[in-house]
């Protein structure tokens, strides 16, 4: 018997999405972003499915070491950089690139004794104001890194967009101009584009693109859907009905008696809840896919279960599958009902959810 709840990961969908992004940015190499356990899809699962990617972007050194231990040979980049001086020998030993965004990292590089230089991507704060050296700091920082024997040459250059997922917002153009003016005529690779940049801002594509959410079949833009770009959802979050009950008009259901039936109906109880990472704040009406149709959540999501209104004439039975999001029910749609973003839904699944290649 298949486990439930489970996240079924489609290798063909992942490969399709990589191909779509390559077509969108045909002159760029692809740094597939697989941080946060491959956006909840399983780090090694995703890396193995995307073995033709030119490199992988990660948030933590531990993630990079897991990929190397799993046999991944491609370029790896720590998108937040290293955190401690003791990380540096591991970067050297395992051939891992690092972002540099802060003076403290430069000091650690200058003071380290290493067997060979580290490949560095200098992050420029072109307007997001989160990580990166400011335009005023750039020349001095670049000179220090150039003079540092522990930094491989050439130094690569990157920035990150604040509003690329708002296609009508000109701020992305401002950031591109800032970055391009600062880095004009310098050697090394350049990378600006995240998923939204790759899909909506072709002039940002550069030497490398760094797609994340789009690889998993999800649009980065609110109100949009990955299918509009030829993307296919890579995750089907599936559980099953563990009870089907006749329910009388006027009867409440669930904690707090939050919802009361207005007419006789049949309710289904689905074996998934906030203990599995399904949001407790999912409101009444959030859709679940059961036997070829959308049915609404009613009552509060509890730790292990949620309830759906199957309708008075429903023929659904205990054991029938329920799709919380996936190919038939886009995660973007579910996120919009809940008032969050698809990124949060796919990355917050807990270890109780079995992640398996379909």
Swiss-Prot record:
So what does this one do? Catalyzes the interconversion of L-alanine and D-alanine. May also act on other amino acids.
Quote the catalytic activity from the record: L-alanine = D-alanine
EC number(s) in its UniProt entry? 5.1.1.1
Q: What is this protein called?
A: Alanine racemase
Query: Which annotated residues bind substrate?
Result: 130, 303
The cross-references to PANTHER family, in alphabetical order and at most eight, read: ALANINE RACEMASE (PTHR30511), ALANINE RACEMASE, BIOSYNTHETIC (PTHR30511:SF4)
Name its co-factor(s): pyridoxal 5'-phosphate
Family stated for the protein in its record? Belongs to the alanine racemase family.
PTM sites of type N6-(pyridoxal phosphate)lysine? 35
List the GO cellular component terms.
Answer: cytosol
InterPro entries recorded: Ala_racemase, Ala_racemase/Decarboxylase_C, Ala_racemase_C, Ala_racemase_N, Ala_racemase_pyridoxalP-BS, PLP-binding_barrel
Q: Name one Pfam family in it.
A: Ala_racemase_N
User: Which SUPFAM superfamilies did the record assign?
Assistant: Alanine racemase C-terminal domain-like, PLP-binding barrel
Q: What class of enzyme is it?
A: isomerase
Q: Residues in the active site?
A: 35 (proton acceptor), 255 (proton acceptor)
GO-annotated biological processes: D-alanine biosynthetic process
Which pathway features in its UniProt record?
Amino-acid biosynthesis; D-alanine biosynthesis; D-alanine from L-alanine: step 1/1
Any idea which UniProt keywords this protein has? Answer: Isomerase, Pyridoxal phosphate
What SMART domains does its record include?
Ala_racemase_C
Q: Which GO terms describe its molecular function?
A: alanine racemase activity; pyridoxal phosphate binding
């Amino acid at each position: 018997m298949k486990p439930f709840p489970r996240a079924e990961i489609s290798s063909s969908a992942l490969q399709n999405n990589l191909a779509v992004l390559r077509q969108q940015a045909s002159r760029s190499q692809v740094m597939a972003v697989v941080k946060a356990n491959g956006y909840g899809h399983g780090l090694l699962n995703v890396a193995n499915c995307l073995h033709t990617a030119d490199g992988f972007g990660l948030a933590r050194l531990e993630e990079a070491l897991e990929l190397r231990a799993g046999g991944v040979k491609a370029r790896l980049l720590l998108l937040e950089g290293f955190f401690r001086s003791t990380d540096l020998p591991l970067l050297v030993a395992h051939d891992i690139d690092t972002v540099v965004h802060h003076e403290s990292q430069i000091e650690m590089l200058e003071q380290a004794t290493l067997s060979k230089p580290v490949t560095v991507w200098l992050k420029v704060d072109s307007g997001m104001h989160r990580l990166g050296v400011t335009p005023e700091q750039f020349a001095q920082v670049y000179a220090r890194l150039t003079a540092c024997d522990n930094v491989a040459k050439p130094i690569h250059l990157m920035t990150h967009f604040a509003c690329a997922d708002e296609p009508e917002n000109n701020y992305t153009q401002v950031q591109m101009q800032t970055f391009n003016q600062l880095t004009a005529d310098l050697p090394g690779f350049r990378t600006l584009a995240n998923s939204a940049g790759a899909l909506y801002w072709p002039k940002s594509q550069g030497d490398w693109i760094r797609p994340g959410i789009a690889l998993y079949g999800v649009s980065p833009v609110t109100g949009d859907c990955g299918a509009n770009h030829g993307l296919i959802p890579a995750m089907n979050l599936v559980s099953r009905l563990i009870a089907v009950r006749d329910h009388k008009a006027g009867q409440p259901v669930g904690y707090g008696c939050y919802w009361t039936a207005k007419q006789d109906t049949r309710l289904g109880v689905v074996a998934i809840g906030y203990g599995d990472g399904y949001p407790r704040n999912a409101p009444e009406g959030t859709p679940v896919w059961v036997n070829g149709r959308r049915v609404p959540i009613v009552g509060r999501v509890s730790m292990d279960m949620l309830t759906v209104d199957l309708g008075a004439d429903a023929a659904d039975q205990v054991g029938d599958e329920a799709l919380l999001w996936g190919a038939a029910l886009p995660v973007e749609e579910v996120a919009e009902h809940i008032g969050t973003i698809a990124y949060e839904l796919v990355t917050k699944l807990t270890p109780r959810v079995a992640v398996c290649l379909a």
